[in-house]
């Protein structure tokens, strides 16, 4: 080993020691030789002591030749022999027990294998039977479902036919007719002519009010029969509400009719001022659109522009409701035909069913489209995914845009007076 002081490796002959480490390394050989000598001396000492402790051979022979020693040796051998026999017998018995246990275990294993094989065969047979039985039960359930669905479809078709029949009979009892004179076509309801929305400017207030009153009554009755809910809620006359009105689409079906203020012919704010202003409920009440007027439309537009706008909005909402009801019952209505309320109402309640009756007599599809979709049955429910897809195909114009279009049409058709009317005090 090298010295950690001088850093030189030790060599006994060539490099003398210069420090304690080198001296210690020089002494290692002597120490190792002394250790080997001590080990050899100890081994020789042990061998000598073992030889000294052994008895002489003559004494051993003498001890074995004495009778007592021979008897003791024989007894010792006999006891050892008996012990060996007993131990052998015990080992043989233990072996027999182990053989019996092994044989019993093998027998149990064979029995279990037989049982498992039998169970597997039984399970295979049962599985084949269960699969067949399950298939039969599944087919039976499918047949029952198909039969139930077919019965359900038949009941729904019958219900739709009854709905259509009730609507047609109600329209006929109410006097809904189509009158054709030359090239002009007019519609009559309740003995009064259904006003043309494009000619409201020239119609009298009584004719407009009566016509809209009849329309909302027959439309509400038809919606009850068809179990549909119109987008814009109609308020029929009731206590303290002598004339019909209509709500906007966003305000419909959210409030009780008794809580909604009556839209009088003057500004509605006078009635709203009588309500408790500290109650948030009354502040949020919707404003109903009137479906009646008490003066000619040009006069109303000049004297009460706010009431005129509300009335036009109500007319547009009513036309939108009629068109929506037609589309939901399979009666096509184009975007330009929404304002033809009389024609749409007649086609919904009478004309469309007459056309379907003719097509069924010619061998066409006899399933009535009217009455199929509704809000009152799970079958063909208008609130389902299928019904929502149907509603998205209507493509009806927005009531606000419809009101603007009607307002512009009426303003363009309004007659311009040739003379300016002056009050009496203007001559003084």
Curated annotation (Swiss-Prot):
InterPro entries: UV_resistance/autophagy_Atg14
Coiled coil regions in record: 82-143
GO biological process: autophagy; protein transport; SNARE complex assembly
Membrane topology: Peripheral membrane protein
Localization terms from the record: Preautophagosomal structure membrane; Vacuole membrane
Record's keyword terms, sorted: Autophagy, Coiled coil, Membrane, Protein transport, Transport, Vacuole
Consequence of gene loss (knockout): Leads to the formation of sparse hyphae with necrotic centrality, and a reduced number of condia. Fails to penetrate both hosts in infection assays with the two susceptible hosts rice and barley. Also leads to delayed mobilization, reduced lipid bodies and lower turgor pressure of the appressoria. Impairs the delivery of ATG8 to the vacuoles upon nitrogen starvation.
A Pfam family this chain is assigned to: ATG14
One GO molecular-function entry: SNARE binding
Induction: Expression is hihghly increased in nitrogen starved hyphae, as well as in invasive hyphae.
GO CC annotations, alphabetized: endosome; lytic vacuole; phagophore assembly site membrane; protein-containing complex; vacuolar membrane
Main location per the UniProt record: membrane
Quaternary organization: Component of the autophagy-specific VPS34 PI3-kinase complex I.
Family: Belongs to the ATG14 family.
The record's note on its domains: The coiled-Coil domain is essential for autophagy.
Function, as annotated: Required for cytoplasm to vacuole transport (Cvt) and autophagy as a part of the autophagy-specific VPS34 PI3-kinase complex I. This complex is essential to recruit the ATG8-phosphatidylinositol conjugate and the ATG12-ATG5 conjugate to the pre-autophagosomal structure. ATG14 mediates the specific binding of the VPS34 PI3-kinase complex I to the preautophagosomal structure (PAS). Plays a crucial role in hyphal development, conidiogenesis and pathogenicity. Also required for glycogen mobilization, quantity of lipid bodies, and the turgor pressure of appressoria.
Protein name, UniProt field: Autophagy-related protein 14
Organism: Pyricularia oryzae (strain 70-15 / ATCC MYA-4617 / FGSC 8958) (Rice blast fungus)
